């Protein structure tokens, strides 16, 4: 049985939990900062053709559509039909924005070679079967001079201080085992180069929080609503320990998020 986290919801309840998580994280100041940094590196221009690969609820696709304007276009792709339906429900036609086309598709097997000026892929590679193949596929989507932006987390860099470290190590080890590629964030620059792209730029945003409610909105293993991520034997003690550290004001949580941008040679 595949028990990896963040996979497409198999039930209405699972889908609802996933949508709630994505809604919550999209409003978090760290995610907003990461996206602002990525957009600064990309310098999206009016009239460009953009692919959002793994669009989720579509909030970035809508931002990109505003940047490219009516002369540009955005294709928003997601493998999960229910997620794509949710993105469509959230779509609002904005006259000064480019057209958004929503498509069901697998990031690793898209077939629009050379069709885009910009490709955006955020927090997707940690979940795909083969991140290297996925990056090569995304690079093929670019026309000459086109830019690819990949954003992802290095879950091995997740720090939780204020809780017994033996317990923490056990819980975080189990959590990382539920992510297909937990360390992919650190590999982004190398993967862009191996896909034949040039002039890579890498930035890291260190998400730091000293409040449990704030950190739990970004890190699922800290969230009681995701308690199934914690081994049964540790679950009760883990959340009691987090609550106690939080009440004492002794909790520190940190997580590195990487942004990498490179371009296809002209």
What are these regions (language model features)?
Residues 28, 147-213, 227-231:
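Conserved catalytic/acceptor-binding region of the Class I
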Residues 195-197, 257-266:
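Core SAM-dependent methyltransferase catalytic element
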Residues 51-53, 57-109:
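Class I SAM-dependent methyltransferase SAM/SAH-binding core
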Residues 117-131:
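A short SAM/SAH-binding and catalytic strip from SAM-dependent methyltransferases
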Residues 109-118:
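A short acidic, Gly/Pro-enriched loop at the edge of an enzyme's catalytic core
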Residues 1-48, 59-63, 67, 83:
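Conserved class I S-adenosyl-L-methionine
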